[in-house]
Curated annotation (Swiss-Prot):
Alphabetically ordered keywords of this record: ATP-binding, Hydrolase, Nucleotide-binding
Entry keyword Nucleotide-binding: yes
Stated name of the protein: 5-oxoprolinase subunit A
Role noted for this protein: Catalyzes the cleavage of 5-oxoproline to form L-glutamate coupled to the hydrolysis of ATP to ADP and inorganic phosphate.
Pfam family, one: LamB_YcsF
The gene coding this protein: pxpA
NCBIfam families: PRK05406.1-2, PRK05406.1-3, PRK05406.1-5
């Protein structure tokens, strides 16, 4: 039976501001990425998200981003590799404290937004992220964009496990990178089209780029975004589609 991990970015509320559909999404995913306070989230939200994840028995990962609350961590920043290392180590350490306090164990790290996209094409940024993971806990996996040489080389250098990731509702360019959110066609808004893309990636190992070219994708995890208007409906639909196609949903071992 084919096996795939479904991951989702959660814990993105901040103070009085609620974001996402965390409670409704949790039953349909096998792992989550928890915002660590730089681009979203706060200490109370981090604790509550960890506790809920443990109740649903899903794998818990840190979701470190740039210190950019106003831009939600989606804007590129001109930072050094040392700064990236510091940002990532600080954030994953904070989440790990909450996970340990709840009696759990953190499984992975997935960079957020602009940090993720920069790392996918910038070896120095990817290296800094992998080094922070290695120094924090080398048993943690790194979730990174499928086929990214920067992520692959960084994970190999520090001997950490890379879990290659694809996206259910994002379009791809011919080089295998994601279409920028600044472009109109970055998101797939039609649920049926998104599910068709996911099945192609999981069962056939490719995705159609925005120009119609086939791009090879060997994904071990699929990202669902939990903050969209129909996020819960889509999560439920993809979960049932996988069941129908005898695709087992579970976190990477």
């Amino acid at each position: 039976m084919t096996t795939i991990d479904l991951n989702c970015n959660l814990g993105e509320s901040f103070g009085a501001y609620k974001m996402g559909n965390d409670d409704e999404i949790l039953p349909f995913v096998s792992s989550i990425n928890v915002a660590c306070g730089f681009h979203a989230g706060d200490p109370s939200v981090m604790r509550q998200t960890v506790e809920k994840a443990m109740q649903h028995n899903v794998a818990i990962g840190a979701h470190p981003g740039f210190p950019d609350l106003i831009g939600f961590g989606r804007r590129n920043m001109n930072v050094s590799a040392n700064e990236v290392y510091d940002y990532v180590l600080y954030q994953i350490g904070a989440l790990d404290a909450f996970v340990k306090a709840a009696g759990g164990k953190m499984q992975h790290v997935k960079p957020h937004g602009a940090l993720y996209n920069m790392a996918a094409t910038n070896p120095e940024i990817a290296d800094a992220i992998a080094k922070a993971i290695y120094h924090m806990n080398s048993s943690l996996s790194l979730y990174g964009l499928a086929n990214s040489e920067a992520f692959i080389q960084a994970a190999e250098k520090y001997n950490i496990t890379l879990v290659q990731e694809a996206f259910a509702d994002r379009t791809y360019k011919e080089d295998g990178t994601l279409t920028s959110r600044t472009e109109e066609n970055a998101l797939i808004k039609n649920e049926d089209e998104a599910i068709k893309q996911v099945l192609q990636m999981v069962k056939e190992g490719y995705v159609n780029s925005v120009n119609g070219e086939k791009v090879a994708v060997q994904a071990q995890t699929i990202c669902l975004h939990g903050d969209g208007e129909k996020a819960v409906q889509f999560a439920r639909k993809i979960y049932r589609t996988f069941e129908h196609n005898k695709i087992s949903i579970c976190a990477p071992k």
